[in-house]
Amino acid sequence: MKTPKLFKQCISVFMVILALSAGCSKKSMSVSGNGGGSNSFKVIGYLPNGTSLSAGANQVDFGKITHLYVAFINPDSLGNLTGTTDLKAVAALAHAKNVQIMASIGGGGAPKYYPSFLIGDKKSKLIKDLVNLAVDNNLDGIDVDLEGALIDANYENFVIDLAAALRQKNKQITAAIATVYKDQFTDKALAQFDFVNIMSYDRTGPWRPDKPGPHAPYSMAEEDLDYWLNTRKIPREKLTLGLPFYGYGFGGNAPESVSYKGILKQYPDSINQDEMHLNGGMVYYNGLPTIRKKTQLAKERVSGVMIWQLLQDTTGARSMLGEIDGVIRGK
C-alpha cells in the first residue's frame, strides 16, 4: 500500500521533532556555566579570607568551579561581623563567571565565645546580620561550618531559624559536616540545608602525634559516603565529597601542615604518591591519582566535590583542580 506524499512529509517532520526532544532531554554533566543547577556536578572551593580577599580571588580559576565559599566571616566578641572587606567585589567577580558565592561561618578555629551567639538575643542579631550580609553583598547564601563543641544542643534551633530567614530572601544555606561528629547532627538540623559537604579528611593530624599516618585515605571517603548516604539517608543530590589540598607531617622536623603547592616546591615529582619522607619525618597527603580516584567516586555516588582550600593548589599540569576538572569532563 502506498503512503500519500503529504502524509510521508508529516511523518518525517514528526520524527525530527521526536529526535530533537530526545536530545534535549538527555542529562549532561557540566562543571562551568551552570551555577550549580540540578543536573550539574558541583565543584565547591573554599577561599581563605586573609589579608586581601580580592587578591586571593584573582588567583582562582573560576572556569573549573561552580561555587566559591569565603572562609570565614565571623562575629567579633561584640557581635559585629568581621572580614567583609572586598566581599561585594568578589561576589561580582564570581557571578560574572557564573559561579555562586557563599560566606562561610565558623571554621575549625572559630572563636571560643561562639556558643553565646547561638542562643537568645545574640542569636537573633547574628541571624539578622548574616541575612543582611548575603543580601547587601549579593551572595547566594550562607555556609555553616560549626564544628566540634559548637554542634551543641542549640545548633538545631540555630540552623532552623537561619534557614527560615535566608529563604525569605531567596538565599541558600549549606553546611560542612564531618563523620567524627555524626552523633551531634540531628536529622532535623540536616534537613534544613540545601546540601551538605562532607569534610572527608583530618582523620589524624598534629593534634594526634601518637597517631601518625594518612589523614584522608581513599577508604575514608568510601566510609564517609556509606554513612551519610545509607545510614543517615541523605539523598545523593544533597551531598558532596570533601578533598584536601594539603598534608600533615609527623616525626623529625617534618612540617606539621603543608600545602600541596608547598610539597611540590620541594619535591616536584611527588604528584603521584600520597606520602613522602621529609626532614627526618613523614608527610601524608593526597597525590593526583588519589584525587582523581576520589573525584570519580563522587561522580558515581554524590553530586559534587568540595575543596579545602583553593590557594593550596599549584597551576599547570600538576594542578589538583585541573585533575578534578579532567575527571568531570571525562578526560
Labelled PLM ranges:
Residues 29-134, 213-214, 218, 226, ...:
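Glycan-recognition patch characteristic of GH18 chitinases/ENGases
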Residues 68, 103, 144, 196, ...:
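Conserved, mostly hydrophobic/aromatic
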Residues 2-11:
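Bacterial N-terminal signal peptides that target proteins for export
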Residues 78-85, 128, 148-267:
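Substrate-binding surface in catalytic domains of secreted glycosidases
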Residues 20-23:
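C-terminal motif of bacterial Sec signal peptides marking the signal peptidase cleavage site
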Residues 25-27:
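Bacterial signal peptide processing site
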Residues 236-301, 322-331:
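Glycan-binding loop/region signatures in secreted carbohydrate-active enzymes
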Residues 47-49, 72, 103-107, 146-148, ...:
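A cross-domain feature marking catalytic cores of carbohydrate-active enzymes
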